[in-house]
């Protein structure tokens, strides 16, 4: 595995040498993944990770976050945050969300951004491992309403690389922004390309 990219001081850290070693070991175990690109220097970010076609994507993402010693959060249905896995999910960065909540998921996550000094939220724009006709727009609305950038991270199974790409502010039109995002993600090879 190549050297890790430089980590800007503004990014929230876990401060865990053991976690970093575990993350590096997991990246090697999962097929010798490397981390490429330049990490963004923002303390609040929506990280859009794609293409998402396999359960392994989650484990590569968690391993990379641990290896980089970054405190990256992710969303999970509130009903999975129960004993015996609740403590593990929370310690890995899970944020329980209730889809039936009057604020909706977007409102709950925007409130989380507003209450946090720093928050890196990683999620999949596809919203599913299956092939989808269109990406969900929730991540875009979260970034727009919370006034935080969207940073693109690609999973390239052809080269076993997790690639930090460009960051952008949510513009006036989701469809226009999506075109820009897809131009980056089309350079990546999914684990199951037929589902990308």
Locations of regions flagged by a protein language model:
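Non-catalytic C-terminal accessory region of glycerolipid acyltransferases
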Residues: 2-18, 29, 102-196
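Acidic/glycine-enriched edge-of-secondary-structure segments
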Residues: 12-24, 89-101
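Helix-to-loop junction immediately C-terminal to a conserved catalytic motif
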Residues: 15-52
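Residue-level preference for nonpolar/small residues embedded in alpha-helices
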Residues: 18-20, 57, 81, 134-135
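A general structural signal for well-ordered alpha-helical segments in protein cores
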Residues: 23, 58-61, 106, 178
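A generic structural signal for alpha->beta connector loops
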Residues: 32, 69-71, 91-93, 118, ...
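Catalytic core of membrane glycerolipid acyltransferases/transacylases, capturing the structured
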Residues: 38-100, 157
